[in-house]
From Swiss-Prot:
Pfam families: PGK. It comes from Thermotoga sp. (strain RQ2). Its EC number is 2.7.2.3. PANTHER family: PHOSPHOGLYCERATE KINASE, PHOSPHOGLYCERATE KINASE 1, CHLOROPLASTIC-RELATED. This is Phosphoglycerate kinase. InterPro entries: Phosphoglycerate_kinase (IPR001576), Phosphoglycerate_kinase_CS (IPR015911), Phosphoglycerate_kinase_N (IPR015824), Phosphoglycerate_kinase_sf (IPR036043). The keyword rRNA-binding does not apply. Its main location: cytoplasm. It comes from the Bacteria. Belongs to the phosphoglycerate kinase family. Monomer. Keywords: ATP-binding, Cytoplasm, Glycolysis, Kinase, Nucleotide-binding, Transferase. Pathway: Carbohydrate degradation; glycolysis; pyruvate from D-glyceraldehyde 3-phosphate: step 2/5. It is an enzyme of class 2 (transferase).
C-alpha cells in the first residue's frame, strides 16, 4: 500500500509537527556525528520552502522518562541551525505552557525544536494524553523517523490518531527500497548477513529464505553455524543455546533449495585488540583453543565475491568481522566494495542500519549503494516481514 507523503498535502501557513530521528552521539555538548541530522534536511527544507511553520519532535538516547542533562537536544539545535543556516528555536520542555507559547509565536518559515521526547514517561508508553497535546500544536504530522518505526510511541504512532500523518522523504525512501527487497526482489537475490548474534537474525533468515537464492553468513554468528556442522571453533563467540536452531535453519534452507554459504577460512587472534598476533586458518583444519575468529579470511572473501557476482538484488545486514579494529576490518571492507561494484552494474543494493551503516561510513562508501538504511532494529523487523507500527500509522494514499 502506498503511503501519503509530505508532497500530497498543502503546507502553506500550516503548522507541521515533524517526528525526526536526531538520536545522534553527543559528547561534552557537541554533536559527534551529524549523519542523521543531515538525512532529515531535504524534508525540513521542503516544508520551509512550502511556507510551513515546523516543530520538531525527537528522542536522544535512553533517558528514563525524566529530564537528564546529558540527553538534552540543545546541542542538536545548535548543529541543526548551522546546517540550515537559520536560527532553530529551542524549548527546554516537552509539554506545557512554555511549549504552547513558543508554538503560537512561530512564523512561516521558522523552526522550533522541543526537548527530548523521552524526558516524558508517556512517550514510550504511547500515552494518548501526551499524543493529544502534541497533536494540538499542529495541523499535520510528518513522520520522518524510520529508526523508531518499529516502536509504537506517542510521537510517531499515538499522535496520528488526532491529526493526519504523512511520510517525510527519508521515510518514503526507506519504505520504497525495503519493500522492493522484501516483497518484490529481482533475481538472483543474495542476502549477506553478519554481526554477532544468530538470535537477532533468525526472523530475517526465515523470512528471506522464501525469496533469496543465496544467503552468505559471516561475522561472529558464523561460528554458531560452523559449530552446528561439527567444526572446531576454538574460543570464538558461539551462542550455545542456538546451535540446534542453526542446524534447523540449515536443513530448512536445503529443503527450499536456498544456498547457505559459510566461510571456509577465518582470521584468528587470542585477543580483540589492535596489533595482536593474528593468523589465517582454514575452517576445516579447526580453530585452536584459546584463539578466536575475528574476521572472514581471504579465501572466504573470494568465495563471497563469486557468490555475489551475478546478483541483481543484494541485502547486507551485519559486518563480517570486528571492523572497528583495522586488523579485523578487511573482510567487511572487501564485501562492502564487492556489493558497491554491483550497484554500479545496476543491481539494487540495500545496507541495513546499525553496524553495517557504520562500516560503510568508515570506508567512505556511503554513496555507493542504492540505499543505506537509517534504522537498525526497524530495518531488521521490516525484512522479517513484520508490519511496523510507525509505518502503519501513516495515512494511505487514496486510490
Amino acid at each position: 500500500m502506498e503511503k501519503m507523503t509530505i508532497r500530497d498535502v498543502d503546507l502553506k501557513g500550516k503548522r507541521v509537527i515533524m517526528r525526526v530521528d536526531f538520536n545522534v552521539p553527543v559528547k561534552d555538548g557537541v554533536v559527534q556525528d551529524d549523519t542523521r541530522i543531515r538525512a532529515a534536511l531535504p524534508t525540513i527544507k521542503y516544508a520551509l520552502e512550502q511556507g510551513a511553520k515546523v516543530i520538531f519532535l525527537s528522542h536522544l538516547g535512553r533517558p528514563k522518562g525524566e529530564p537528564s542533562p546529558e540527553f538534552s537536544l540543545a546541542p542538536v539545535a545548535k548543529r541543526l541551525s548551522e546546517l540550515l543556516g537559520k536560527e532553530v528555536k529551542f524549548v527546554p520542555a516537552v509539554v506545557g505552557d512554555e511549549v504552547k507559547k513558543a508554538v503560537e509565536e512561530l512564523k512561516e518559515g521558522e523552526v522550533l525544536l522541543l526537548e527530548n521526547t523521552r524526558f516524558h514517561p508517556g512517550e514510550t508508553k504511547n500515552d494518548p494524553e501526551l499524543a493529544k497535546f502534541w497533536a494540538s500544536l499542529a495541523d499535520i504530522h510528518v513522520n520522518d523517523a524510520f529508526g523508531t518505526a518499529h516502536r509504537a510511541h506517542a510521537s510517531n504512532v499515538g499522535i496520528a490518531q488526532f491529526i493526519p500523518s504523512v511520510a517525510g522523504f527519508l521515510m518514503e525512501k526507506e519504505i520504497k527500497f525495503l519493500s522492493k527487497v522484501t516483497y518484490n526482489p529481482e533475481k538472483p537475490y543474495v542476502v549477506v548477513l553478519g554481526g554477532a548474534k544468530v538470535s537477532d537474525k533468525i526472523g530475517v533468515i526465515t523470512n528471506l529464505m522464501e525469496k533469496a537464492d543465496r544467503i552468505l553468513i559471516g561475522g561472529a554468528m558464523m561460528f554458531t553455524f560452523l559449530k552446528a556442522l561439527g567444526k572446531e571453533v576454538g574460543s570464538s563467540r558461539v551462542e550455545e543455546d542456538k546451535i540446534d536452531l542453526a542446524k534447523e535453519l540449515l536443513e530448512k534452507a536445503k529443503e527450499k533449495g536456498v544456498e547457505i554459504v559459510l566461510p571456509v577460512d577465518a582470521v584468528i587472534a587470542q585477543k580483540i585488540e589492535p596489533g595482536v598476533e593474528k593468523k589465517v586458518v582454514r575452517i576445516d583444519d579447526g580453530i585452536p583453543e584459546g584463539w578466536m575468529g575475528l574476521d572472514i579470511g581471504p579465501e572466504t572473501v573470494e568465495l563471497f565475491k563469486q557468490k555475489l557476482s551475478d546478483a541483481k538484488t543484494v541485502v547486507w545486514n551485519g559486518p563480517m568481522g570486528v571492523f572497528e579494529i583495522d586488523d579485523f576490518a578487511e573482510g567487511t571492507k572487501q564485501v562492502a566494495l564487492a556489493i558497491a561494484a554491483l550497484t554500479e552494474k545496476g543491481a539494487i543494493t540495500v545496507v541495513g542500519g546499525g553496524d553495517s551503516a557504520a562500516a560503510v561510513n568508515k570506508f567512505g562508501l556511503e554513496d555507493k549503494f542504492s540505499h543505506v538504511s537509517t534504522g537498525g532494529g526497524a530495518s531488521l523487523e521490516f525484512l522479517e516481514g513484520k508490519e511496523l507500527p510507525g509505518i502503519a500509522s501513516i495515512a494511505d494514499k487514496k486510490k
